[in-house]
């Protein structure tokens, strides 16, 4: 009498890396939910408090400006990251000599590499612009003081309202440039614009043009920094008085002006 034994199904143990990925994703989702609940609770509390004062419009004005500026910062920094990543891609056909494994991963996950990563970088480095909403609102509602400084002949309101906005814009531009350089380096490394040959670093023509353009933008930003530093002198705090000293006006100011012009040239 023959007996037939049913083959037993092999039980596969779950992959450890897969389980760890699920656990990490669960923690991230829970953290996002908790953070969202805290934000909603704080917003609701503030709305109720401002409503009691019959000034809820003030609250929505603050939040509206914060959200708008945060979105602008995110899009500018994220857009700079995306643009430089796309510019570093190899347009002509043929094989590349960059990091093939990483390049293939980026090509297999285009939404993550070309959209998700730039947006994440923009959220981290650009969205904090939202915290400077007061600076921009004050600038939009500025009024002249009717008195000018003795050195540059600018109305005092320029130093109170306009100069902080210019510094904020310059700071955001520097962040965008730093992100651009980082993504350009990564992109050219992936697509063969930057490679090693015989122990030395070789830059393709497109990489040289790309980095040269970024260097030119950096020089312009340096010139802007030196130019704004001229006005910052009048706001300096010295040991005995506030404002620019004799040395600042007669020695430092001409030197900074020359540095600003030299950075552009």
Segments predicted by a language model, with ranges:
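Contiguous transmembrane helix-bundle modules in multi-pass membrane proteins
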Residues: 3-48, 53-154, 163, 167-265
């Amino acid at each position: 009498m023959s007996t037939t034994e049913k083959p037993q199904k092999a039980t596969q143990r779950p992959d450890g890396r897969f389980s760890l990925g699920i656990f990490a994703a669960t923690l991230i989702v829970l953290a996002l939910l908790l953070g969202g609940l805290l934000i909603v609770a704080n917003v609701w509390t503030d709305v109720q408090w401002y409503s009691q004062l019959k000034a809820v419009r003030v609250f929505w004005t603050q939040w509206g400006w914060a959200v708008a500026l945060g979105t602008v910062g995110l899009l500018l920094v994220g857009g700079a990251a995306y643009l430089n990543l796309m510019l570093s891609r190899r347009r002509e056909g043929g094989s590349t000599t960059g990091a093939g494994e990483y390049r293939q991963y980026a090509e297999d996950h285009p939404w993550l590499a070309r959209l998700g990563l730039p947006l994440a970088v923009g959220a981290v480095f650009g969205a904090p612009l939202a915290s400077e909403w007061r600076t921009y609102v004050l600038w939009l509602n500025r009024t002249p003081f009717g008195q000018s400084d003795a050195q540059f002949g600018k109305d005092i309101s320029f130093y109170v309202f306009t100069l902080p906005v210019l510094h904020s814009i310059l700071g955001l531009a520097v962040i965008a440039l730093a992100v651009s350089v980082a993504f350009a380096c990564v992109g050219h490394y992936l697509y063969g614009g930057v490679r090693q040959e015989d122990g030395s670093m070789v830059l393709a023509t497109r990489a040289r043009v790309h980095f040269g353009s970024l260097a030119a933008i950096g020089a312009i930003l340096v010139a802007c920094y030196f130019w704004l530093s001229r006005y910052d002198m009048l706001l300096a705090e010295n040991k005995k008085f506030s404002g620019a000293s004799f040395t600042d006006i007669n020695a430092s100011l001409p030197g900074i002006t020359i540095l600003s012009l030299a950075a552009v040239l």
